[in-house]
Amino acid sequence: MIRLIEKESILELIKKSFLFLITLFTISLIGYGDRFFIESRFGLAAVGDYFFYINIFLFPFSLFQTYIGFKEIVIFKNKYDLSILKTKLILLLKFSFIFSVLLFSFFLLIEYFGIYDLKIKSNLEIVLALIFLGNIKIIYSLLSSVIGAHSDNSMLYNINLKSICSILLLAPVIYYFSYSVFLVIIYIIILWVIRCLIWYNQIQKI
């Protein structure tokens, strides 16, 4: 009996690990696939500029995203309900907005005082889109913490299925209608928003 239980537990662990692997694959696809697409569609110069603005206006959000993810998963493991999540989401949105304003203002001042020409005005739509994407990814990190703390195989299966379907549905649009780097970022934002909605929908069932 003990051996059967152990065998079942191992199989469940393998199944859950595989589902998490698919989750990581889909997030890597929407998190890093844009670089390869921009390079193939617009050339090395365009992807070089894109990397430059990502490092300045998106990477700072990624640092907070990682911190929030590790911190909150421990908290949600011990205590969780939907009202706590909603409160944290509101606080995080406020923090993220303030941080966005400070980040944009800081680099705008750097350019204004002639410290470094970031060409913000000529690439304003890309800069603002990346900052908005950073906000979405911070919100996602909180939702992901809940999933990481309380997900089961059924939940992971539903999340992965819906995520893959959203990528497959939007992929032709991205391929045929990406006329600029800005539009590529907009499509990536849409994918992240869809992912957040999928996560939140599943979280409500916990």
Language model feature labels by segment:
Residues 1, 46, 106, 113, ...:
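Membrane-interface helix-loop junctions in multi-pass transport and translocation proteins
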Residues 1-8, 66-72, 142-146, 173-178, ...:
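C-terminal transmembrane helix end/exit motif
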Residues 1-29, 74-84, 203-206:
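Interhelical loop/hinge segments that connect adjacent transmembrane helices in multipass membrane
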Residues 12-16, 20, 38-58, 121-124, ...:
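Interfacial/gating helices of multi-pass transporter permease domains
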Residues 13-28, 32, 36, 54-63, ...:
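Residue-level signature of transmembrane alpha-helical cores of multipass secondary-active transporters
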Residues 53, 57-81, 148-149:
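Helix-loop junctions and terminal segments of transmembrane helices
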Residues 78-107, 154-160, 203:
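Membrane-water interface segments that mark the loop-to-transmembrane alpha-helix transition
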Residues 134-161, 203:
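Membrane-interface junctions at transmembrane-helix termini in multi-pass inner-membrane proteins
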